[in-house]
Swiss-Prot record:
Gene Ontology cellular component list: mitochondrial inner membrane; respiratory chain complex IV
Role this protein plays: Component of the cytochrome c oxidase, the last enzyme in the mitochondrial electron transport chain which drives oxidative phosphorylation. The respiratory chain contains 3 multisubunit complexes succinate dehydrogenase (complex II, CII), ubiquinol-cytochrome c oxidoreductase (cytochrome b-c1 complex, complex III, CIII) and cytochrome c oxidase (complex IV, CIV), that cooperate to transfer electrons derived from NADH and succinate to molecular oxygen, creating an electrochemical gradient over the inner membrane that drives transmembrane transport and the ATP synthase.
Annotated binding of Mg(2+), by residue: 198
Descriptive protein name: Cytochrome c oxidase subunit 2
UniProt subunit comment: Component of the cytochrome c oxidase (complex IV, CIV), a multisubunit enzyme composed of 14 subunits. The complex is composed of a catalytic core of 3 subunits MT-CO1, MT-CO2 and MT-CO3, encoded in the mitochondrial DNA, and 11 supernumerary subunits COX4I, COX5A, COX5B, COX6A, COX6B, COX6C, COX7A, COX7B, COX7C, COX8 and NDUFA4, which are encoded in the nuclear genome.
Record topology, Mitochondrial matrix segments: 46-59
Organism per entry: Didelphis virginiana (North American opossum)
Family: Belongs to the cytochrome c oxidase subunit 2 family.
Uppermost EC category: translocase
Single annotated GO MF: cytochrome-c oxidase activity
Compartment(s): Mitochondrion inner membrane
Amino acid sequence: MPYPMQLGFQDATSPIMEELMYFHDHTLMIVFLISSLVLYIIILMLTTKLTHTSTMDAQEVETIWTILPAVILILIALPSLRILYMMDEIYNPYLTVKAMGHQWYWSYEFTDYENLMFDSYMIPTKDLSPGQLRLLEVDNRIVLPMELPIRMLISSEDVLHAWTMPSLGLKADAIPGRLNQITLTSSRPGVFYGQCSEICGSNHSFMPIVLEMASLKYFEKWSSMMQSFLSYLYI
């Protein structure tokens, strides 16, 4: 999770986020080298009187500055396309969860379980327990099993929202009348925080997402408990 005065990304929790961090470092290195070269040329031009004002043709130079940017773009595009393919690939998910955005809360439905659906509201600041995080805690966390592929279906009941979980490298738009599909896999247990990342009205900043990744045994116990509680609640 993020912490005050943090530099860089949150700790990666999924293989996708690890790939995104490597790609970020790879691209940043290329940008740094290009910027250094441009800065060096500018300084050289400002500090020397030897300029080629009479040069009319330089095919070798033109060939180099045409081919070199093309090679650099390929070096950026290939890993980017690979990660895009990995993010869209969904193979035999263990379960499917539908997340619906509302003004201003989230609702979740486990489509593989009967009557397992609930709303998730932010806990007001005055109701927080010691140690809980302001504007990030919810009354009902979404619990999922770790180390298993999970398919998320994202949509909205009213306006545009965005379901975002930085530690997992996920961000999907919630659009009314349309289902967006993403996959997530957590490599470790823990509680992870996200928020709506699309301005959706006056309480946009009060739509946190809390995802608890746990063992499969704990998840099955939690799902059974939630089903029993919801069945009793709606009798």
